[in-house]
Amino acid sequence: MIGYLNLVYAGLHEPPSSWTIIPPDFTISRHVEVLLSVDSTIYIVDNLENIDQRISRGPFTHLAASPNGKGLALLSYSGLLWVVSTDFQRSLAEFNTKEVVGVDGPVRQIQWCANDAVIVSWDGLVLLVGPFGDTLQSVLFIAHFVRGLKLSYRYFYSGSTFAITELDGVRIIGPDVCDFVQKVPGTYHRR
């Protein structure tokens, strides 16, 4: 017999455009919560109830929960990256991905870089969006990020990438490299 999670029926008549999971350790209900992008809103579904968050900013092509379960990154069909608290009460950052010069094709992936920033990736380009919408574009090397400055460096990978969120950063795997991006530790800021 195959085990499965019994979720409350969310009233879906078609598949969600995107979804993500928040583990039970990070939810008030202490149940696994699945966030579903349906039409212009987000449903939070667990094994007891489903709650329409009544958000009118969707639909969203990509959803990603931060490793600590406190933040969400949502990418709309219009290309707006919206970073918000998981209770949808605090907007942390907004960034229009359509304004990135040199991007070819749709966004392939969004992932968190620890709990501090979000990675947006296209074929051959990775963009790091910081807590206030600051950006750092990279491929092979991530420069020292100084708080308060808007940095924009452009480096390209030789092909598609895949990003994996980790507790202290994000691993970016390309055709010929594996990079690890993390926040510069506080001890380096004082030098």
Regions found by a protein language model. Name each.
Residues 2-191:
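Intrinsically disordered, low-complexity regions in large eukaryotic scaffold subunits
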